[in-house]
Amino acid sequence: MKQLEVGDRVKILDGGKDDEGTVLDVDERTEMVIVYLGRHVGGRAFHRDDLRKVRAH
């Protein structure tokens, strides 16, 4: 299981080439991660397998 933490920068694997965001919350029980994608998009929930860590906070 990928270890993601609040503040990590992540790339959304099923998104476009510029779809990166910041982890806001991680639910270990459901393996869902809330990612902030910017002020125009806001936060979205993704399964942790759909994300790749770009760099740590």
Feature map (PLM): residue ranges:
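Basic/aromatic-rich interaction segments and small domains that mediate binding to polyanionic partners
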Residues: Q3-A56
